[in-house]
Amino acid sequence: MRSHFAHEINFIGHRRVLLTVSAVLCVLSVVGIIARGLVFGIEFRGGTEIDFQSTGDITIAQMRDALASAGEAEATVQTATSEGEAGFLVRSDTTDPNTANAHAAAAAEALGLTKANYTVTTIGPDWGADTVRSSSIAFLVSILAIIAFVSLRYEFKMSITAVAALVHDLLIIVGVYAWTQVPITPNVVAALLTIMGFSLYDTVVEFNRMNENARRGGDADHRTYYQIVNFSINEVIVRTINTTLTTLVPITAMYFLGGTTLRDFAFAMLIGEVLGTYSSFAVASPLLAMWKTREPKWAKIEKKYGATTATPVGDKTADGAE
């Protein structure tokens, strides 16, 4: 297979710029997490969620006043739309179900609403702690499984750089949540785990092509590992972008047309899909190329042919490929 482009895009030649952009985004994410902190849903910290539906012309100020008079002055209120009807999503730290129901009923009465206009969900702190523990275990097991799979299928260096790209993606997504103060819910955690799969897929596709081209290239064809990696990215980048764009269409529809629950999932997925595609060629592949070039075999080839860049990498390595 030849590159999709008449002239290859020099991704590896711009690796320092790409890695610097990623480093800046990661630093901004860490700053956001430290400075603003993360807002967790009641599923993680325990508390109450009151979903007011079909509230008509009631304003957010009126809702806050009603909640304050009912004993929920510290509750957070956000507007929500379900099936075209206006509503509100209220979150508070109340963990006693009886108290939560009493407060919800009092607020509804003050606003002229009935029991049919709201639902109350209360989660105790123990359940929230279990959710945190389960989510942490899920992420740890996923990372270890990725390292094991990529190491066995390809090599250890590829597994570490693939995980580095995943950490890059997840850190930036969490940073966005810190800066925007959007609550992290179990749906967000599910989205993060899904993003790990998409990001890993993009990276493995590139790694697989690098392996194939590396077997055909090398000293005999005067091909450095940097050149092999760059050509491999150019071979698969169009397919990767097309796959991402195709996936973004239903996710975007889910974000704008779905309810609050679907929007939580879709928001993380929108960010993660873009980051996963970016990190595959801007983080994982450059890091692998830099690491592999230090190996004696590839270091020797780099020293001999590293300055030879006039001939497109694909002219020889791709001959006879589909």
Question: What role is predicted for each listed range?
Answer:
Residues M1-E322:
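A structural signal for conserved, well-ordered secondary-structure elements
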